Amino acid sequence: MAIFVGSLQIRIDMPQFTHLHVHTQYSILDGAASIPSLMKRAKEFGMTAVAITDHGNMFGVKEFYDAANAAGLKPILGCEVYVVKNHREKDKDEKAGDHLILLAKNLKGYHNLVKLVSYSWTEGFYYKPRIDKELLRQYHEGLICSSACLGGELPQAIMHDDLEEASRIVEEFKEIFGEDYYLELQLHRSLSGAPDTDTCRHQVEVNKVLHDLAARHGVKLIVTNDVHFTLEEDAPAHDHLICLNTGRDLDDPNRMRYTGQEFFKSPDEMAALFPDDLEALENTMEIADKVEHYTLEHKPLMPDFPLPDDFVIDQAELRRIFLRRFDGQISGLEKKMADADEAKKPSLLHEMEGLRTEKAQAETADDLDAFAAGNERL
């Protein structure tokens, strides 16, 4: 990037940057960025790493992991989780939860992230999958955390002018995550000079306080763009997607709206938005460097059925089990035959004859294991 001082042109090396807050099409409500398009864009921008942080799920993680590795990019696997006071309580005042970004730093962190997201669905689901800070304390190892968007607990405290609570929140997360906790700056301002949206004005005010909190509490800042679609020209399609998924009309004044700036911006575009926060831009690479290379590949996980050392398969009992399976299927067909119209009876009769033939073979088969392996009905 070049700037002019009088007639003198000066070349400035832009800081390196990577996106750490990215929603793919697997963010079911509002994600419109396909994984292949994100990889293509990241390569075009010369990035070396990119993150996935879908809303409350990890459905796209394996596809993202494979695509990033194929593209020569480091996959940073994460999730934007919803945090409530008690994930087991169904409190309508907390049904949405506060947003929080979690990124897996290593394989241990990935496993802990899987546990957190699993618990959010199996124990904490109430309108949305939710966790709480008790779970975060239990499964924080190997995770990097950032304060998220305006929907995060910290930005919400700032927007409500509760700076004492904001300081308490920073200290709480710092106690849990230590140097792996970051404060997240966002600014959805158009570079073309379009008027600021309400969202952008809120972000400006929140960012001012985040700078103060970062200095006061010794926490580093990062810059993100809360990516929801890949290209700037995808904004109208993303807007239509929101309407479809929320059942609202485009002209509904009270519907969910985005700014149109939530696209996968280049490092230069992000630097232009944050000219005074070059260190926060560089800190995204600090996080990328923290993330270790690890594999998701493993052997098939088979259930373990412990058997006593003296266990012997009783061939006679095995044969009885096979025959009971055939008897059950034949009985079911006989009931269908009784209620079927005449047009269907020939096909049912043909199937029943086949089952009786196979039952007769099972009664006389020498190798029941081989017989069962070759029989799709068993």
Positions of predicted regions on the chain:
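Phosphodiester-processing cores and adjacent nucleic acid-binding clamps
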Residues: 3-378
